[in-house]
């Protein structure tokens, strides 16, 4: 076997060659190439004239001496037009029912069948055997067929509960294509002088028969780590809970795993990685509704669980709560004690803030959380001037709950110990306390836990950075995963600065 990274580079260059002159079809070419290299089938859905047949023709050039067969199905198509005509000579001389398969599907490595759902039962039944077993019964003999890639295309989906569902289930990769959207790409397509049928692939990049056969064995040796299986099982369970989720057969799951193994193999890895699971978005959908649903579920999996994002946020939440508990345990020591002013005959008792409280905005911790204005509150931010005026003159006082949003009206009072007490609607009170001195920093327990969490984040980010070098995964998906990891990092840093 070639060095894994050299193989990955070669497949990347091969794909780039195949993509030349095709606009906004990179993802389709790459997945069709992956399907061809792993012996799977592809269904292309889209309107006429968007290069579906050209994609299939291009894939022939990925292999040395590959033969191609393409056919446009109609309601009147016969098996002879797909699998070859009957040999009149054999029937006449020997009474043998035998087809002449040269130049037809049974002897082609790359097969493209357009308007696939218009095929009749006789063609469909033979095609199912060809896809499943890579065999063709020719008279009394069963012949092995060399098909590496079947690309089926249509501008419509098969009717539900029809005889076509069995064939549709064999199409592992399903791609929904549309016309060229980008203005610059549209202009380039219109003015291109390239002959679309020319071979764009250098000989050195083409796959030999020996390489193809060897790779099939090596793909099967790619391992499925436990943590990746757990992600797959999580996705399967989540889909089973959704009422509108498509039915995914055990056969489709098993074939999808081999595709993930191929993705890892041709990316230079020895094991399936979480990033490979993004390919499932093109394997598990059935129709337009399920396409969106599958993408949403895989997005949740990738941005919330694949690199432990949600787990790290849960741990962070527990650390923050513990930090608050430690702060609240110190609240009696740091309770804000205001200074009483005036004599005993004053009409209203007046107070002022201690001289060492100088910040323009005061953040005071609740000794115990209270529910204020439908929010669980652990600290309140006051404008110093507003609090001083209330201590001196009384009236209305407002503060920002948990330091966010608009300042809300509060039920605040000074108790007999000259501590500030805030009360909820049921008049339960909580003493307000100054946070610990900034010089004290984070408690050692909290600091250590945050450092351990940050270390785990770095490991997960390093894994993602290493795994994201995958030709078959669109860049926008990788961008969303990176953003989810950076969000976790930002929240960890924020907690470290508290």
Swiss-Prot record:
Entry-linked InterPro entries: AAA+_ATPase, ATPase_RavA, ATPase_RavA_C, MoxR, P-loop_NTPase, RavA-like_AAA_lid, RavA_ATPases, RavA_LARA_dom
GO cellular component assignments: cytoplasm
Pfam family, one: AAA_lid_8
Keyword flag ATP-binding: yes
Single GO term (MF): ATP hydrolysis activity
Localization, UniProt: Cytoplasm
Keyword flag Zinc: no
Protein activity control: ATPase activity is stimulated by ViaA.
Binding-site list for ADP: 23, 49-54, 196
EC number: 3.6.1.-
Reactions this protein catalyses: ATP + H2O = ADP + phosphate + H(+)
NCBIfam families (alphabetical): PRK13531.1
Family to which the UniProt record says this protein belongs: Belongs to the RavA family.
Subunit and partners: Homohexamer. Interacts with ViaA.
PANTHER family per the UniProt record, alphabetical: ATPASE RAVA (PTHR32204:SF0)
HAMAP family: ATPase_RavA (MF_01625)
Record function comment: Component of the RavA-ViaA chaperone complex, which may act on the membrane to optimize the function of some of the respiratory chains. RavA functions as an ATPase.
The name this protein goes by in its record: Regulatory ATPase RavA
Organism: Escherichia coli (strain ATCC 8739 / DSM 1576 / NBRC 3972 / NCIMB 8545 / WDCM 00012 / Crooks)
């Amino acid at each position: 076997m070639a060095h894994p990274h050299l193989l990955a580079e070669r497949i990347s260059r091969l794909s780039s060659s195949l993509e030349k002159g095709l606009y906004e079809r990179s993802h389709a070419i790459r997945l069709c190439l992956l399907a061809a290299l792993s012996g799977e089938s592809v269904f292309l859905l889209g309107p006429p004239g968007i290069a579906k047949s050209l994609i299939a023709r291009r894939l022939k050039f990925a292999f040395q001496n590959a033969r191609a067969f393409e056919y446009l199905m109609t309601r009147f198509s016969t098996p002879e037009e797909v699998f070859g005509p009957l040999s009149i000579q054999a029937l006449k001389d020997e009474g043998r029912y035998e087809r002449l398969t040269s130049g037809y599907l049974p002897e082609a490595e790359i097969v493209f069948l357009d308007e696939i759902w218009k095929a009749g039962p006789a063609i469909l039944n033979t095609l199912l055997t060809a896809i499943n077993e890579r065999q063709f019964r020719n008279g009394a003999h069963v012949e092995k067929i060399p098909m590496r890639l079947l690309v089926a295309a249509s501008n419509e989906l098969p009717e539900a509960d029809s005889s076509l569902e069995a064939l549709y289930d064999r199409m592992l990769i399903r791609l929904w294509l549309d016309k060229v959207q980008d203005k610059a790409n549209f202009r380039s397509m219109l003015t291109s002088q390239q002959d679309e049928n020319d071979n764009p692939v250098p000989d050195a990049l083409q796959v030999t028969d020996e390489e193809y056969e060897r790779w099939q064995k090596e793909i099967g040796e790619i391992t499925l780590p436990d943590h990746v299986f757990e992600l797959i099982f999580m996705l399967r369970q989540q889909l089973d809970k959704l009422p509108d989720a498509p039915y995914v057969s055990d056969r489709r799951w098993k074939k999808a795993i081999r595709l993930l193994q191929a993705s890892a193999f041709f990316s230079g890895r020895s094991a399936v990685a979480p990033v490979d699971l993004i390919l499932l978005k093109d394997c598990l959908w059935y129709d337009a509704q399920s396409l969106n649903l599958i993408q949403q579920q895989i997005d949740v999996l990738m941005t919330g669980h694949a690199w432990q994002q949600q787990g790290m946020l849960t741990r962070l939440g527990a650390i923050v709560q513990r930090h608050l508990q430690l702060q609240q345990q110190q609240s009696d020591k740091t309770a804000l004690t205001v200074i009483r002013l005036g004599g005993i005959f004053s009409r209203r008792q007046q107070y002022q803030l201690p001289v060492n409280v100088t910040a323009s905005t005061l953040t005071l911790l609740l000794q115990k959380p209270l529910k204020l204005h439908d929010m669980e509150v652990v600290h309140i931010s006051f404008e110093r001037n507003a609090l001083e005026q209330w201590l001196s003159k009384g009236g209305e006082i407002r503060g920002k709950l948990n330091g966010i949003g608009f300042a809300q009206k509060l039920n605040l009072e000074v108790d007999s110990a000259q501590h500030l007490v805030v009360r909820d609607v049921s008049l339960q009170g909580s003493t307000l306390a100054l946070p610990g001195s900034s010089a004290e920093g984070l408690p050692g327990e909290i600091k250590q836990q945050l450092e351990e969490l940050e270390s785990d984040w770095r490991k997960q980010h390093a894994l993602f950075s290493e795994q994201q070098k995958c030709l078959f995964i669109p860049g926008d998906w990788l961008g969303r995963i990176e953003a989810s990891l950076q969000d976790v990092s930002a929240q960890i840093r924020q907690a470290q600065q508290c």
